[in-house]
Amino acid sequence: MRFPKIPKRAVAATVGIVATSFTLASCVTNEEQGNPDGWEQIVPDPVPEIQAMVPEALAQRGVLTAGANPPFPPFEFKDSDGQIIGVEMDLVRAMAGVMGLEFSPQEQDFSLILPSVQAGTLDIGASGFTDNEERRENFDFIDFLFAGVQWAQATDRETPIDPENACGLTVAVQRTTVAETDDVRPRSAQCEAEGKEPITILSYETADTAATALILGRADALAADSPVSAWAAERSEGRIEVVGDMYLAAPFGFAFPLESDLTPAAAAAFQHLIDTGDYQRIMAQWGIEEGLLDEALINEQPLN
């Protein structure tokens, strides 16, 4: 779950971790191989009745644009050719196919994506957005996943990490994510309130750099969105593992302008992906099998 970044550089990263992260990043994000093993592109044929719902101007243009801010694997990141890939890109591409459109991901600073959607220079935002009440004042969201925070630890750690007893630990996070703002920092404050040693928080610009800190032993744990922690563990060559259950669950969604004519068409396309099983297949290719939806939701509400 992502919120606009604070416009300053990471202060926790040292020269050593930055240098080493280049050699370990491919283990964590799979950048060299790009898509997961066995991945195949799923682009359904257009569905005429859904295609007819697409606003005329977009139908004539023929290309659906989506703003993304990599890296945030497995949601969006760049492969070795510099192409933006990830589960959100696959989902939006499939939705576009159902609507008879091509798909064009557009890299943009995270803080500028929603304003660009609102201004009409992007059709949608697809960059790990949490669907919450504050954002719904200006945007509608087609939800695609319910996910929460989950911690990870080194697999060779003798004493398992317990997030409920984390005082005195060093925890790596991606800056301004819910894992930092709503989980680790409040936990640390509670430690201090109880007279215990606070949590040392290492905040990084990207999730893969935070995971690298855990791999290098600079952190005792990683706290991140559950799919992010699971992806990092899967790509770590057995060096880290998720621990405990996820919590603070919330919906992830694609952002649309408020009351946009495109939203009903895109929601119908997403429902088609669910009905045909393409949604489940796309998610499974990225190792996401929990928190899936049974029906399309706009702002957590069913279409009918």
From Swiss-Prot:
Its main location: membrane. A lipid is attached at residue 27 (N-palmitoyl cysteine). It is a lipid-anchor. The complex is probably composed of two ATP-binding proteins (ArgV), two transmembrane proteins (ArgU) and a solute-binding protein (ArgT). It holds the Pfam family SBP_bac_3. Keywords: Amino-acid transport, Cell membrane, Lipoprotein, Membrane, Palmitate, Signal, Transport. GO terms for biological process: amino acid transport. InterPro entries: Solute-binding_3/MltF_N (IPR001638). A lipid is attached at residue 27 (S-diacylglycerol cysteine). It comes from Corynebacterium glutamicum (strain ATCC 13032 / DSM 20300 / JCM 1318 / BCRC 11384 / CCUG 27702 / LMG 3730 / NBRC 12168 / NCIMB 10025 / NRRL B-2784 / 534). Residues 1-26 form the signal peptide. One of its GO terms (cellular component) is plasma membrane. It is found in: Cell membrane. Belongs to the bacterial solute-binding protein 3 family. Disruption phenotype: Deletion of argTUV in an L-arginine producer strain results in a faster and 24% higher L-arginine production in comparison to the parental strain. Part of the ABC transporter complex ArgTUV involved in L-arginine import. May also transport L-citrulline. Binds L-arginine and its molecular precursor L-citrulline, but not L-histidine, L-glutamate, L-glutamine, L-lysine or L-cysteine. This is Arginine-binding protein ArgT.
